[in-house]
Amino acid sequence: MRKSYRIKKEAEFQNVFDHGDSVANRNFVIYHMKRDQPHFRVGISVGKKVGHTAVMRNQIKRYIRQSLLELKPNIDAQTDFLVIARKSANQLDMAGTKKNLIHVMRLAGILNEDIEVI
C-alpha cells in the first residue's frame, strides 16, 4: 500500500485510540474512527509479546498488509483504523490472517459489502 494509506505518526495513532471505537476478536483489535478524506488510512501494531523476533513480527505485518490490499475495494473510504495483533496472531498463516481480519472488520462496520471467506 502507498504511504498515503498509512498512519505513521504517534499523534495520529493516539487520536484514533482516544476518539475511536474498538472491536476485537481472538487475534486482532481494531480501533476505528470516521473522517472526511478521499481514502482510508491504516496503522499496524505488532508488539514484542506477539512475536519475540523481528522476523516473526514483520511476517505478521506483511500478512496484515497483504490482506488489507486484497480487501481494499471493500473498505470504507471515510475511515482511519488501527490493527493491533494479539499474541495468538503469531499462529496464523496468510489465509487465517485474512479470515480473522474480515471477521473483525465486519464487526467494526468497516467493510462495505459481504465478502466470501475462502
Curated annotation (Swiss-Prot):
GO terms for cellular component: ribonuclease P complex. Keywords: Endonuclease, Hydrolase, Nuclease, RNA-binding, tRNA processing. The keyword Protein transport does not apply. It catalyses: Endonucleolytic cleavage of RNA, removing 5'-extranucleotides from tRNA precursor. GO terms for molecular function: 3'-tRNA processing endoribonuclease activity; ribonuclease P activity; tRNA binding. It comes from the Bacteria. Disulfide bonds: none annotated. It is an enzyme of class 3 (hydrolase). Belongs to the RnpA family. This is Ribonuclease P protein component. The gene is rnpA.
